Regions:
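Short amphipathic recognition helices of helix-turn-helix/homeodomain-type DNA-binding modules
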Residues: 1-30, 37, 44-46, 58-109
């Protein structure tokens, strides 16, 4: 496993994931329109307005949007690592869960 894959394993929260997504876009040096066009060349949908909303609002992207974005940015070999990071972030933000917590924790009386 290389450094990039290890770094992606460190991502645990939606905020961490979103920060890394913004950094990925910056490293790509591509505009939202260029990213949308790159995805379209591969037969994928990557609406630039949706992508901009996700990166601006810090929300978790849908898995298919995340995969298309990662490939468009040139990190296609890490799609599975990104999707695993997204899954961890989604689980961490699920109701009744928190960092280090578990579902159903907390007393009922």
């Amino acid at each position: 496993m290389d450094e990039r894959a290890l770094a992606l394993q460190e991502l645990r929260t939606a905020a961490d994931l979103n920060t890394e997504l913004r950094e990925l876009k910056a490293r790509s040096r591509l505009t939202y329109r260029q990213l949308e066009e790159r995805a379209a060349e591969k037969g994928e949908l990557l609406p630039r307005s949706t992508l901009a909303d996700v990166l601006r609002n810090g929300s978790l992207p849908r898995p298919e949007l995340l995969a298309a974005f990662v490939r468009a940015c040139g990190e296609g070999e890490y799609v599975d690592d990104w999707l695993a990071a997204r899954k961890r972030a989604a689980e961490a933000s699920a109701p009744g869960r928190g960092p280090g917590g578990s579902a159903g924790s907390g007393g009922s009386g």
